[in-house]
Amino acid sequence: MVGLALLARLEERFLPEKRKVSPARRVSIIGISAAIAAVLHVLDFPLVILAPEFYKLDFSELPVLLCGFYLGPSATVICEGVKILLKLLLKGTSTAFVGDLANFVVGCSLVLPATIFYHAHKSKHSAIIGLAIGTLVMTVFGSAFNAVYLLPKFAQLYGIPLDTIIAMGTAIRGGVSNVSTFVLLCVAPLNLLKGAVVSVLTMLLYKRVARPLFGLHQ
């Protein structure tokens, strides 16, 4: 909460062109975006040609980005948090909240850089650059987060040796031999794919969706 309040203050100081909306409308936009994101999150699916099946691909950051492009970076953090809460209500957790935490923090690593850069420059070009930066940050951060926290935690959660998870990666990508190559050859491509698809959809849909959904007039 302290970090979110600080982010909001920084927005006011360094992003003066951020769109002003009433508190009620802001809550409404975040709520609608989070609800759509939660549904997309529930519809996640494995992509076993890239990573073991317990890694799921979803495009729930799309409505979060649309919300953030409209309202600003702090809205994306709130939207991500509400998305996770709604997903837990709809589907529960199968990973003792480990996967839910990962989705939140890795999602934020995409949407925060993208929306911060966009609102700092406010143009189509800056949106493209921001999304590229966000995808790169998510790929690097997601890989590091997996190596340091997520993979050991999954091994502990499922009661299996870490080497067993590495072997799952080896079965998919022959070059996987340790944690480093696992995140490089399995996790990073998955995050790159997600970032690329979400970025393209954001650019295609923002103006089309923002007008009817958010009341965008410019």
Where are the model-predicted features located?
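Loop-helix junctions at membrane interfaces
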Residues: M1-Q218
